[in-house]
A protein has these predicted regions:
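Surface-exposed, charged secondary-structure patches
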Residues: 20-23, 30, 60, 73-119, ...
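Short, aromatic-enriched amphipathic alpha-helices that serve as compact interaction elements
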Residues: 26-45
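Positively charged n-region of N-terminal signal peptides that target proteins for export
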Residues: 1-4
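Low-complexity, intrinsically disordered terminal/linker segments enriched in charged
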Residues: 137-169
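Bacterial N-terminal signal peptides
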Residues: 6-16
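Solvent-exposed loop/turn segments at secondary-structure junctions
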Residues: 57-59, 65-68, 112-116, 140-144
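A short, structured loop/turn motif at beta-sheet edges
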Residues: 97-104, 126-134
């Protein structure tokens, strides 16, 4: 009898773990679909759709150290690009998604192919809402090969000094 009860208990626990794994895989696909649609909206210069994927308190971190924007600040920055009929084009090459145990938060990182910036990396956090997954934070970066870091470090430091010495009094 103990063996039967133990086997039943193990079967129940195992089925719950398997169901959660399937559910997490489904949620990961949903997050991926949101990100793909978000990138497609930028490529199509669909400003309304693009910004509908952001949470109201979202933050966008751009490639420049000065680029930390709320959703609304980023929209003001990006509006001229969308208004011209072509914003930007990011294609996810690889993507990894992790779903939090409470299934209300997901984080990801993705390698991106872009025609204007070259290889990039996007990472961020999405939150589950009654309207679906929303981007709470997105960080766009340009990976620098380790062998080039010293060169870029010097150029960035020099750029900062050059900008500070060229400021009007």
């Amino acid at each position: 009898m103990k063996r039967v009860l133990c086997a039943i208990f193990i079967a129940i626990v195992a089925s719950g773990v398997a169901a959660q794994s399937v559910d997490n895989a489904s949620m990961s696909r949903d997050v991926g679909a949101v990100l793909d649609a978000w990138h497609a909206a930028a490529d199509a210069a669909d400003e309304e759709k693009y910004f509908s994927y952001f949470a109201s308190d979202a933050v966008f971190l751009g490639t420049d150290a000065t680029e930390r924007w709320t959703r609304d600040e980023f929209r003001r920055f990006a509006h001229p690009y969308f208004a011209k009929g072509k914003a930007w084009s990011f294609k996810s090459v690889t993507r990894w998604v992790t779903i939090a145990p409470d299934r209300k938060v997901a984080w990801f990182d993705e390698a991106l192919a872009t025609p204007h910036l070259g290889p990039c990396r996007g990472s961020g956090v999405l939150v589950a809402t009654s309207a679906g997954w929303k981007i709470a934070q997105y960080n766009l970066s340009i990976p620098i090969p380790n062998d080039l870091v010293d060169e870029f470090k010097k150029r960035i430091e020099g750029f900062g000094k050059e900008k500070s010495t060229n400021k009007a009094p």
